[in-house]
């Protein structure tokens, strides 16, 4: 306080629906919500597939490109909360990568998230490659980070308690976050769209 901000979890699977709820939106016909930040659930929904599949005219990174073309409908894109996963959804990674060479989806996803306009949100455990789907229930995607409680056999808060793949992901994300923190052009810069020419 006084810079306190509340994010609105208006779970809309389309950009215009989310933009409607943001403060200053012209889409809600003068009934301003005064809600400074809204969440980009549409991005989260398409990112979970886009970074894991082949890019073509109607799939993969092309869906991300199309989604980003609608940033202009938000009154303030820099106050849109963007994320790849959260406590109510499948994890971004459906399963644990088997080797460092299998980290391409993770690295592309977090790099994208941390270099686009908006407020990036990382869900706990993302840096440790926590993975899974809601098929087994919400508890499965909300597991404790090993090492946080007495009696835990593994401590993933220490490098020695993480696998080689987890340490690679941890170090990559740590480096990326430090780089972003020192670069206003990345954290607060503008995005320009170009036509895709395949």
Each language-model region and where it sits:
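Active-site-proximal helices and loops of the catalytic beta/alpha 8
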Residues: 1-75, 102-103, 112, 129-175, ...
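Structural preference for beta-strand elements that scaffold enzyme active sites
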Residues: 3-7, 79-82, 120-121
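Active-site clefts of carbohydrate-active enzymes
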Residues: 75-100
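C-terminal substrate/ligand-recognition segments
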Residues: 114-126, 165
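Surface-exposed helix-capping loop/turn segments at secondary-structure junctions
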Residues: 181-193
């Amino acid at each position: 306080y006084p810079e306190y901000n509340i994010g609105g979890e208006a779970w809309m699977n389309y950009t215009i629906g989310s933009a409607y709820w943001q403060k200053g939106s012209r889409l809600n016909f003068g009934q301003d919500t005064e809600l400074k930040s809204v969440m980009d659930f549409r991005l989260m929904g398409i990112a979970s597939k886009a970074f894991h599949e082949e890019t073509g005219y109607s799939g993969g990174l092309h869906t991300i490109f199309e989604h980003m073309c609608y940033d202009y409908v938000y009154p303030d894109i820099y106050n849109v909360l963007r994320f790849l996963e959260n406590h109510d959804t499948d994890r971004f990674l459906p399963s644990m990568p088997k080797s460092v060479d299998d980290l391409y989806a993770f690295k592309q996803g977090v790099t994208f998230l941390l270099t686009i306009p908006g407020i990036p949100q990382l869900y706990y455990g993302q840096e440790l490659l926590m993975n899974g789907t809601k098929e087994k229930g919400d508890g499965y995607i909300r597991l404790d980070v090993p090492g946080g409680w007495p009696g835990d056999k593994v401590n993933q808060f220490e490098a020695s308690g993480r696998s080689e793949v987890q340490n690679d992901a941890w170090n990559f994300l740590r480096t990326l976050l430090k780089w972003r923190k020192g670069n206003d052009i990345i954290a607060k810069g503008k995005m320009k769209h170009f036509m895709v020419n395949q």
